[in-house]
Design a protein with these regions (language model features):
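Non-catalytic interface/linker regions that flank or bridge core catalytic/transmembrane domains
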Residues: 1-160
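Histidine- and acidic-residue-rich, metal-dependent catalytic cores
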Residues: 5-7, 105-276
């Protein structure tokens, strides 16, 4: 059943885009809006409590609709949906390991994209915190399966998938160095997935530039750890440990890192883990 309505007044209702691949067959716990055309206003598509089916998803894809829109006020319900889905995927014995890894990494990629799209919003950061707790549990519950998320990593260091990979790697490394410390493991996974938050505003052509950077370009790159840390500092739910990790992940014990050129013990354990 499709519920039509007048276009959503975006001045009153803040919406965020969600890939339709995020949805599987289930009873909706949130309202869904869609845009009939890229520049068209959003209209109500399904209301809370109505079933969304795989056939519905397929029909939308056939109409070349890639995104649905959810009210920001219902972000917590979307967090639950995505969290439940990745949990089910990780433990699904019917999925090949490669497919499990692909689905989980794709979900985490979307979570990080939400953080980048909506700066200074607590809801997307809370979703990363939820996922970090799952990663921390998986790292000890089934380290072999969890490590496969890292095995799927590529080599593009300026993508959200790279940030997912760093979060996975931090979880694995801390599990080896500090086994049993779940709080630390969770914090470092979160820091790993957020470590390059400050690169949001840097043009892709600069991030991917080959060869030596001009002095002004280098200064732009050097500032990204401080920019990311400053943004997270505005969110009281983010642990200080995570903020420190984001700020210092390019520092090196010999003083050759940036942005401050910290040396020796001034480079925190968290920053060293992220650097690896």
């Amino acid at each position: 059943m499709t519920t039509a309505a007048a276009p959503a007044k975006t001045t009153e209702l803040r919406l965020f885009p969600v890939s339709i691949e995020s949805f599987d067959a289930r009873l909706l716990e949130m309202d869904l809006y869609l845009k009939p055309a890229p520049d068209a206003p959003a209209v109500l598509y399904r209301t809370t409590g109505i079933e969304f089916t795989l056939q519905d998803r397929q029909r939308l894809m056939e109409q070349h609709i890639e995104f649905l829109y959810i009210p920001m006020s219902q972000h917590k319900a979307y967090r639950r949906l995505l969290s439940d889905r990745v949990e089910e995927t990780f433990h699904d014995p019917h999925l090949q390991r490669v497919e499990r890894a692909r689905l989980i990494r794709a979900s985490c990629k979307r979570m990080i994209e939400d953080v980048l799209i909506f700066p200074n919003q607590p809801e997307p950061i809370a979703m990363i915190a939820d996922m970090s707790r799952k990663f921390a549990t998986w790292a000890t519950e089934d380290p072999q399966q969890f490590s496969y998320l890292l095995d799927m990593s590529g080599h593009d260091y300026y993508t959200t998938l790279h940030m997912v990979s760093v979060g996975v790697g931090c979880g694995l490394l801390v599990n080896e160095l500090r086994p049993g410390d779940e709080e630390l493991r969770t914090a470092l996974v979160e820091g790993g997935m957020l470590h390059d938050l400050g690169k949001r505003g840097i043009p892709a052509e600069l991030l991917n530039k080959e060869g030596k950077l001009a002095p002004d370009e280098w200064q732009t790159i050097r500032r990204h750890p401080l920019i990311g840390a400053d943004e997270l500092r505005n969110n009281p739910a983010v642990p200080a440990f995570v903020i420190e990790m984001v700020r210092d992940h390019h520092e090196r014990p010999d003083g050759t890192g940036y942005p401050e050129g910290l040396r020796d013990a001034r480079v925190s354990f968290a920053a060293r883990i992220c650097a690896v």
